[in-house]
Amino acid sequence: MTLHRFKKIALLSVLGIAAISMNVQAAERIAFIPKLVGVGFFTSGGNGAQQAGKELGVDVTYDGPTEPSVSGQVQLINNFVNQGYNAIIVSAVSPDGLCPALKRAMQRGVRVLTWDSDTKPECRSYYINQGTPAQLGGMLVDMAARQVNKDKAKVAFFYSSPTVTEQNQWVKEAKAKIAKEHPGWEIVTTQFGYNDATKSLQTAEGILKAYSDLDAIIAPDANALPAAAQAAENLKNDKVAIVGFSTPNVMRPYVERGTVKEFGLWDVVQQGKISVYVADALLKKGSMKTGDKLDIQGVGQVEVSPNSVQGYDYEADGNGIVLLPERVIFNKENIGKYDF
């Protein structure tokens, strides 16, 4: 073998090894994006995502904007794409605002999924969904109904914003259920805290002051629910039923003091974990279809459902929804079993 031929073979070997290393690295890099950082709900989801990364041997990066904005999420998405990440999983602040950036990412071969809050279905492959709008909207009304024991009542809705996808879907279903099953309930106001703890507390206090005879506040938002509970304590209002969605660690003191009798959520740590497992399966298998099942360590089996379970008309190959196995009602009896 000539020296020239030896050098050529050696160079090709080095380039081949480098290419393999780059492909392995790219396939192992998954970005997990919340609406914003610094909120316990999203931190818990990120913890689940990173736990899954360790189990699967993939590199999961958790990062989000400091405020819930389309521009902040788009900047992160573009950065992750430019850095060569192979999959992006995002809790969208807007159903359509992220679509141009996500479609560009998909055109470059990046796997795009959503969790917690969806985009339009054509802007992602799979949505890791905590529950259908009917399930979660119904859950909100049922929690309120267990405490509002009268035919005529005044109810307020209070959550993050008028544009966030999932909460508006839940509230739409909840209002429809109220109209059908509790026609004597009057929805006196719908207000927003915009994912800001201070503004949420001010808004909640404003609701309770403006409607002194309010029977229930329905707050399906991780900031709005504790704000409503704190507002009731600040104003010494022990007559209003406060229900909604938040994490057990945040709500524990309000439940223990009796300010909140029960509230709901799902295991957001599991949601983060499932999201990464689905992304990893896509990277390894190439695609999944409706009816496909996936076994997840410590969770069990999940299944790909059509977009129609979320009320969407859009269906396509390699596109669908993965529902969490269950949702949870927290109360004084069981809240001690949970830590997230």
From Swiss-Prot:
<feature type="signal peptide">
    <location>
        <begin position="1"/>
        <end position="26"/>
    </location>
</feature>
<dbReference type="GO" id="GO:0030288">
    <property type="term" value="C:outer membrane-bounded periplasmic space"/>
</dbReference>
<comment type="subunit">
    <text>The complex is composed of two ATP-binding proteins (LsrA), two transmembrane proteins (LsrC and LsrD) and a solute-binding protein (LsrB).</text>
</comment>
<dbReference type="Pfam" id="PF13407">
    <property type="entry name" value="Peripla_BP_4"/>
</dbReference>
<comment type="function">
    <text>Part of the ABC transporter complex LsrABCD involved in autoinducer 2 (AI-2) import. Binds AI-2 and delivers it to the LsrC and LsrD permeases.</text>
</comment>
<keyword id="KW-0574">Periplasm</keyword>
<dbReference type="InterPro" id="IPR025997">
    <property type="entry name" value="SBP_2_dom"/>
</dbReference>
<comment type="similarity">
    <text>Belongs to the bacterial solute-binding protein 2 family.</text>
</comment>
<dbReference type="InterPro" id="IPR030159">
    <property type="entry name" value="LsrB"/>
</dbReference>
<dbReference type="GO" id="GO:0043190">
    <property type="term" value="C:ATP-binding cassette (ABC) transporter complex"/>
</dbReference>
<dbReference type="GO" id="GO:0030246">
    <property type="term" value="F:carbohydrate binding"/>
</dbReference>
<dbReference type="GO" id="GO:0055085">
    <property type="term" value="P:transmembrane transport"/>
</dbReference>
<dbReference type="InterPro" id="IPR028082">
    <property type="entry name" value="Peripla_BP_I"/>
</dbReference>
<keyword id="KW-0732">Signal</keyword>
<dbReference type="InterPro" id="IPR050555">
    <property type="entry name" value="Bact_Solute-Bind_Prot2"/>
</dbReference>
<protein>
    <recommendedName>
        <fullName>Autoinducer 2-binding protein LsrB</fullName>
    </recommendedName>
</protein>
